[in-house]
Amino acid sequence: MTDLELSSEETITCAIIADTHIPDRVRELHPELVNKLISLQPRLIFHAGDISHPRVIAELEQFAPVYAVRGNRDWLFTKTLPLNRTFLLNNRRVFLTHGHLNFHQYWKDKMDNLLLGYNFERYSRRLLAFAPDANVLLFGHSHHAECRNQAGVFFMNPGSCSVAEKPDHQLSFGIIRFSPGGIVSGELVRLN
């Protein structure tokens, strides 16, 4: 089932946000994020989970329609948000997930990260197994920002726009563009 199908003669510009953790780790959306969303005027906002409180969605909806998924810390959304969503944007199949995928994968990931450290290849393999037909995979969870095209699939983890847990993490969000010709491009935007 597809949550949204959207085709346009113009490029569809979307913001992707993850791991806001409001109010369990920070009190509000980063003010620079708010200013950048005002300037960007995205057509859609994707939230890749760990929202923590429903007011975050309401605040983001001031800028564009929000499509969100439930993260491992989104207990308040158990009955209202799915774990995964799919979209068709300018003929590109998009899969949105938090990245923990399910209870079993969450604990496996915890152990792998503890013992082996973060590894993008591990995430990409698991995500592709859940969404083998996707052209675009959007995810969060690790707070590790990624923007790469690999084997014809565009991957983006916007990092966290609220919490930089490790020295190599910076606060960030993502911008992703879907051209009418089916070309997908994206960038990570650092927040100070």
Spans of model-derived segments:
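Acidic, histidine-bearing metal-coordination/catalytic regions of metal-dependent phosphoesterases
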Residues: 1-16, 169, 174-192
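Active-site neighborhood of phospho(di)ester-bond hydrolases with catalytic His/Asp-centered motifs
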Residues: 16-18, 44-50, 67-72, 96-97, ...
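Conserved beta-sheet core of the metallophosphoesterase superfamily
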Residues: 67, 88, 114-187
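N-terminal active-site segment of His-dependent metallophosphoesterases
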Residues: 1-64, 80-83
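Short acidic-hydrophobic surface loop/beta-edge motif
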Residues: 3-7, 83-91, 146-150
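Active-site-proximal loop/helix segment associated with metal-binding centers of metalloenzymes
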Residues: 7-11, 24, 94, 99-122, ...
